[in-house]
Design a protein with these regions (language model features):
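TRNA-recognition modules of translation machinery and tRNA-sensing kinases, especially anticodon-binding
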Residues: 1-224
Length: 224
């Protein structure tokens, strides 16, 4: 629990986390928790920054308060897998890393011919520890609207203060900045991929970037 309470606010914990009864343990809602927790109570030499990590892991979420048509199917589920990225960096570099991280997600989706846009969260929509957050949204031809497929956040030194992640260098000792980004969550990516590459006859066009991994196939044809 010392990691969980350090990486997120109480409101987020209540809405997301599954606690194991009788244990001081939680199921992770994102591998950000495990990766940031790696640096708990550490002093990092400034010349070893940035620290960049990525992880593909199972994720578990209660999704309290979720409702509506999007909650059916694979859009919002209690167990899924996700590729996450985190950065621990110098305070003056966090803005640069923030822009670089969300751009990774945008580039990935656009490489698969999925239209995406970014939406900067207003201050009232930010979780307590976040300095800035951007949602990456993909176009849904079925719903005729964009829906969230990823999120990138700059936590400033908020997580670092809670978890005692410090930097030492010529400027003395100070708190690092931390950031996280959802590269891809396969369930939502699959929705966006199928809807934007589906042909009228039920076949699915394979984007060029994926063809080398599909034996050179250009189209997936349904079995009748």
């Amino acid at each position: 629990s010392n990691v969980v309470t350090g990486v997120m606010s109480f409101a987020e914990m209540d809405a997301m986390m599954y606690k194991i009864e009788g244990e001081d343990l939680y199921l992770i809602g994102t591998s950000e928790h495990s990766m940031i927790g790696k640096f708990i109570d550490t002093v990092l030499p400034s010349d070893t920054l940035p620290r960049t990590l990525t992880s593909y892991s199972p994720c578990f979420r209660k999704e309290k308060g979720a409702h509506g048509i999007e909650e059916r199917g694979v859009y919002r589920i209690h167990q899924f897998e996700k590729q996450e990225m985190i950065v621990v960096c110098e305070p003056e570099d966090s803005k640069m890393w923030f822009d670089k991280l969300w751009q990774n997600t945008v580039d990935l989706f656009r490489s698969m011919d999925i239209p995406v846009r970014t939406l900067e969260c207003c201050s009232g929509d930010l979780a307590d520890l976040k300095v800035k957050s951007i949602d990456v949204e993909a176009w849904s031809p079925r719903q005729k609207k964009y829906f969230e497929v990823g999120s990138c956040s700059n936590l400033g030194d908020a997580q670092a203060r809670r978890l005692k992640i410090r930097v030492t260098g010529e400027k003395g000792k100070y708190f690092a900045h931390t950031l996280n980004n959802t590269v891809v969550a396969p369930p939502r990516m699959l929705i966006a991929f199928l809807e934007n590459n589906l042909n009228e006859d039920g076949s699915v066009r394979i984007p060029e970037v994926l063809r080398p991994y599909m034996g050179g196939k250009e189209v997936l044809t349904p079995v009748k």
